[in-house]
Amino acid sequence: MKTTDVVAWFGTKKAIAEACSEDGWKLTAAAVSQWGEEPPAGRQKQIAALTKGQLTAGSAPSQPETTPAQPSEGQQEMTDNRIEDLNIESIATLVTPTQLKEEMPISEQAVESVCKGRQAIRDILDRKDHRIFVVVGPCSIHDVDAAKDYAQRLRDLAEEVSDTLYLVMRVYFEKPRTTVGWKGLINDPYMNDTFKIQDGLHTARRLLIDLAELGLPLSTEALDPISPQYLQDLIAWSAIGARTTESQTHREMASGLSSAVGFKNGTDGSLTVATNALMSVANPHRFLGIDQSGQVSIVSTKGNPYAHVVLRGGGGKPNYDSVNVQIAEDALSKADLAQNIMIDCSHENSSKNPALQPLVMDNVSNQILEGNKSIIGLMVESNIKHGRQNIPANLDDLEYGLSVTDGCISWEETEDAIRKMREKLKDVLPGRTAG
């Protein structure tokens, strides 16, 4: 029996030390009785072996950083380490969604902001609101102060263009990686491979509350199927990325999200995975998840009627042009889906060159001027400064307001592009109707 198994039953190193004889960590009957209960029958042989000296002086386990789970009442066998969890190093208990929300309750002001944001986006998708909604902001959040700085600027711009464009701040905490790399603020908030996920959840929720209280509608990518229980109450629009659009887990999750959700086409440019996702997410599902108390549960959803496609390019080619938009319209029509199309101005639609994003925005404006009725939204990767930076070994060397993931356009470029779009579309959008 491994020393980790001893820890799993008797708790911490300290508890074992107090329960065992001083001459060599031999477990005795007193060690069992100290815990006030007899061990399960399946552990009798293991404890007997330990009392014969298999756990000797010098093999005392070091204090684990996490507390392994205790056996449930009535459990007859402990995990057989010959066949289970062979590649698991440790399992740590996490704050529950309820506990986090009790620590950081959402204010009435933030609730009002979320409700207004969700309704505005639903109205745009239903063609009750003539505006285009623009999800704009950093590729990922790594600096809370810079995010708040950006949000203040965006709020002012949002008010300026609100008659034509509905601006939604992009607040992405989770990053899918093609291979390896920094997975975002929730996974590694200190950017030093310490992976303090609980701290990441606290930081993310605190920031979302602060931004919602500014009156900004907020968006994020729903990547981890657990995190929405901690954060979704603050989100007005969600994205499912190109790498996960085909995932059954993410389709099921999206069917229960409270916000509208955009599904990107596949990384190869395929529309089929996105249209299949839209058909799936509109229907009820039952799947395994967690409830607000963190209990593993069977989740039954109603289906999400506000899912739509996001064209982001793929296979090394863009797909924002009028020809590809028409192809997407035809695919949606064939699948009997609403012709709601969002254009991602970044990724392969800009050849991963942030400087090309304003050109994509201008092209989309021209399509609408020429009569397009299916484009209802845009995504723009924008930050305070233009470009990107690698994460330095010394985090003090990070440049303020500069992305650490995908390259972004600067704030000045963002203002200019959005104002130009508003100027082009302000007269034509009020008369625009669904085709």
Language-model segments: residues:
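Short basic helix-loop element that most often maps to the first helix and adjoining turn
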Residues: 1-19
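Recognition helix of helix-turn-helix/homeodomain-like DNA-binding domains
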Residues: 21-39
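Short C-terminal boundary/hinge segments that cap the last helix of small helical domains
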Residues: 52-70
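Active-site-facing alpha/beta catalytic cores
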Residues: 79-83, 151, 164-320, 324-325, ...
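N- or domain-start disorder-to-order transition segments that initiate the globular core
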Residues: 86-126
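Conserved, mostly hydrophobic/aromatic
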Residues: 137, 343, 410
